[in-house]
Amino acid sequence: RELILTLAVQGKLVPQDPADEPAGVLLQKIRAEKDRLIAEGKIKRDKPLAEIAEEEKPFELPVGWEWVRCDDYFLELCTGPFGSMIHQEDYVRDGVPLINPSHMVGGRIIHDPRVTIKAADAERLSAYALSVGDMVLARRGEVGRFAYVTQQEHGWLCGTGSFFVRLYSQCNREYLGLIFSDVRFRQHLQGESVGTTMTNLNQRILLNALLALPPLAEQSRIVTRVEALMRLCDALEAKGQLEAAQ
């Protein structure tokens, strides 16, 4: 499975198509959208990061791909509320869920009905409300753990141990999920993170991390191919377990 992900994010899993719109075009659209949101006061302008140096690039990219920092790919990266903003007595059962790293399982959100707050508290913390299309990421513990926000989780809240990422509407979040799942990307974040008893990932580390970005059309082909290969892995593992049990 690790090999499949590594080949996928290095452009070695599906053939390139010269007719695909280059990744640089998508990056221009993202930049224009960020500029619009900044001008409207909806997001803040990030502090500029350094240009990508040649020695930072871990491998050579196929034609049409681009190296990009997460800062230039995300519309917005937000950290969950400080622990002081939510107290133990604020928790109720079956209220508005708070999403912490332990609730991110296999790219899905599995919430705990005991980790929820009243609607009034959720309104107070509305700046941390999740929207359809967002991704939530762990910033404590298992670095690289993530989940997709669907219609069911719209309006739920990012917890104190998490980030949430807002993406441009045309971005393929499933491809970004492949990058977050790749062992090389996770090891990079782990190596940059701080903490002795528990790993802590800060915004600067994540925003500075590099993504190998294919053309949008190729991203879709890669995701489809990876999903098919992972299903095959599941079937082979299930067959092996069945044979071992007999």
Positions of predicted regions on the chain:
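Non-catalytic DNA-recognition/assembly elements of restriction-modification systems
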Residues: 1-3, 7, 12-13, 53-81, ...
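Conserved hydrophobic residue
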Residues: 13-14, 43
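Terminal amphipathic helices with adjacent charged low-complexity linkers/tails
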Residues: 21-25
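Sequence-specific dsDNA recognition surfaces
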Residues: 51-56, 71-88, 102-132, 151-152
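Short, well-ordered beta-strand elements within core beta-sheets of diverse protein domains
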Residues: 58-60, 163-168, 207-213
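Extracellular/lumenal ectodomain signal focusing on beta-strand-rich modules
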Residues: 72, 145, 208-210
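Specificity-determining recognition surfaces
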Residues: 97, 182-211
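A short beta-sheet element
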Residues: 100-101, 119-181, 194-195, 200-202
